[in-house]
Amino acid sequence: MDRKYLANAIRALSMDGVQQANSGHPGAPMGMADIAEVLWRSHLNHNPSNPEWADRDRFVLSNGHGSMLIYSLLHLSGYELSIDDLKNFRQLHSKTPGHPEYGYAPGIETTTGPLGQGITNAVGMAMAEKALAAQFNKEGHDIVDHFTYVFMGDGCLMEGISHEACSLAGTLGLGKLIAFWDDNGISIDGHVEGWFSDDTPKRFEAYGWHVIPAVDGHDADAINAAIEAAKADPRPTLICTKTIIGFGSPNKSGSHDCHGAPLGAEEIAATRKELGWEHGPFEIPQEVYAEWSAKETGAAKEAAWNEKFAAYEAAYPELAAEFKRRVNGELPAEWEEKASQIIADLQANPANIASRKASQNALEAFGALLPEFMGGSADLAPSNLTMWSGSKSLEANDFSGNYIHYGVREFGMTAIMNGIALHGGFVPYGATFLMFMEYARNAMRMAALMKIQNIQVYTHDSIGLGEDGPTHQPVEQIASLRLTPNMNTWRPCDQVESAVAWKLAIERKDAPTALIFSRQNLAQQPRSAEQVADIAKGGYILKDSEGKPELILIATGSEVELAVKAAEQLTAEGKKVRVVSMPSTDAFDKQDADYREAVLPSDVTARIAIEAGIADFWYKYVGFDGRIIGMTTFGESAPADQLFEMFGFTVENVVNTAKELLA
């Protein structure tokens, strides 16, 4: 059957889906249909009957607005995505939301839409493939051997994150990464020459990529030859495909008119005529389905891989068991027992250290149990303390390690980690200063939206970093992380809370975690075994009064020590004071009402929250009758002790505030 005719099935479904929804982006799917047909029918190794097959090729639609392209491909190939699902494009609770979302339709490898993040996720997937291959493959047994393919448009290339990711991909020699640039010269505002005149091929050559320029995106033979050349090259490849946006539309192709709006009934009829597509809306002939179906070939490819894996399992039974455990996202059998013992030992052996150092100690202890750890930092390893004795850096010619030097690429790092998590086989963690999570915020939001694991170590968490000043001192960042749905945020007060936070982050597979650590040393707090267990609840009674409290001090991180000292002074003066350590407000909020009431009794309205972050966040816990000792402005450049005094983080100020409240 004519390849163009098979590609036209994508064009028809895409324009019909957008028309039915009365919103969407038909131009990119219609322009890239020929490329998609060649890639999916002649190259992509996948099995529609098992979208989770470990050694499948990954496909990422980085220009996620063209979502009808991937929905059409999944439907035509035989995935569990019906024609009714396509008719429900962009409708409430459908499997086909406006941008592709991970966890809705089978075969969607990542959520895309915020431009540039798809290509960056793909870099992470390609890194995970290369690292897993280095760790598990043996001579004659290539059980990890797959490609990551990406479609991306001009918008992805304009976004700065594409530079961060593609630069690193070239440095690390990710030869299994193949990207297709949809070079149609059109963005929402019109022809891109006025705002995007880069020499993109030269840009990627400078990154160390293999570049195939000037491929006719509507010539199946040229596309096929380019893919074959890309697969044979040891470098990541950019295939520059010249396409016509809205291909087939007689009056709107080649213009921004077809980028982000339905073609309209009249133009769709004209397009059907132009393409020689004589079938009605959402009608696909059986012979077209038969040509497109990947069920039989996909099952055969997976069966062949299963045979390879059986041979590997016979030769390397322990490695095979470890591979299965890791790709299934399971922790080692001895994890719970050993991790809990590590925490108990820390409580029994107090140390007054910075929580960033406590974090490194947790990595040292837990890392020995977790070969799946894949760490990293955005060029701040000596400050974030993210390397431990078992850390081994990934290098282009040796990917058997477990640590990535991301360079100064906070956004790229975080979105790459999303790709690593989505690929499977690793527990990724990265790091930067808390202030610079701002650069990476949207990628962490995407992790929360996708319900995937992404552990970020954010150090230098307050004015406590001192002399570097307000450019580096976070104020509103902790609150913004806490306010992000499905984000775990922890600000521990000592080495024990730090280890508990790390343990929970490692165990939590369905959400990202922000671990917020101090630069300065923090005093370890005494606790009973029950209190240690209660840390996981996010908030707990650290020090209590004799009888019912008349005042509750709530604190996090470096301010817990301050709250304890103030409570001791107030208690000595006859006040009944409870200290609540609340390292994770979101974990505390998830506890049942009885527990929350036991910790923060509603009839004790005299409450003070103490945190070197934005003050307004804490009204939810202290009420309008309470007080907050927090930040209401940016910081200053000065030694940390002077700043804490200037902004009121002193025992004297807490005590005086308490007395005013109780007066």
UniProtKB/Swiss-Prot annotation:
GO terms for molecular function: metal ion binding; transketolase activity. Its cofactor is Mg(2+); Ca(2+); Mn(2+); Co(2+). Binds 1 Mg(2+) ion per subunit. Can also utilize other divalent metal cations, such as Ca(2+), Mn(2+) and Co(2+). Binds 1 thiamine pyrophosphate per subunit. Substrate binds at H25, H259, R356, S383, H460, D468, R519. It catalyses: D-sedoheptulose 7-phosphate + D-glyceraldehyde 3-phosphate = aldehydo-D-ribose 5-phosphate + D-xylulose 5-phosphate. Signal peptide: none annotated. One of its GO terms (cellular component) is cytosol. Thiamine diphosphate binds at H65, G113, P114, L115, G155, N184, H259, F436. The active site is at E410. Mg(2+) binds at D154, N184, I186. It comes from the Bacteria. Its EC number is 2.2.1.1. It is an enzyme of class 2 (transferase). Keywords: Calcium, Magnesium, Metal-binding, Thiamine pyrophosphate, Transferase. GO terms for biological process: pentose-phosphate shunt. Coiled coil: none annotated. Pfam families: Transket_pyr, Transketolase_C_1, Transketolase_N. Homodimer. Belongs to the transketolase family. This is Transketolase 2. It comes from Vibrio parahaemolyticus serotype O3:K6 (strain RIMD 2210633). The gene is tkt2.
